[in-house]
Design a protein with these regions (language model features):
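N-terminal intrinsically disordered, cationic/polar leader segments
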Residues: 1-34, 38, 46-93
Length: 93
């Protein structure tokens, strides 16, 4: 089967971008090592994950995937706005 131009472009772009994402997740995971980092003093971690999970669920939806995310038993939709506000405060220029 011969792929059209859009299909070829997708196969050229999507896998490497997902590999980059996987790499970035691995780097973030390294920050969880308790021998090198301390994060228990801040709510930064849950707020950042809430924002990222929301972005990932919206991205997945664009590909036709329906993903439900809960954090501590709470639906991400219920806690996203507060988390985004804190995320933006930390990332303000």
């Amino acid at each position: 089967m011969k792929l059209n131009q859009k299909e070829q472009r997708f196969l050229r772009m999507f896998p490497p971008r997902m590999k980059q994402l996987e790499n970035q997740i691995r780097l973030v995971k390294n920050c969880s090592r308790k021998d090198g980092y301390e994060w228990g003093f801040t709510d930064l971690v849950p707020n950042f994950f809430i924002v990222i999970f929301k972005d990932l669920t919206l991205c997945a939806k664009n590909f036709g995937l329906d993903i439900d995310v809960t954090i501590g038993g709470r639906d991400i939709e219920d806690i996203y706005d507060d988390a985004l506000e804190k995320f933006n405060e930390y990332n303000a220029d």
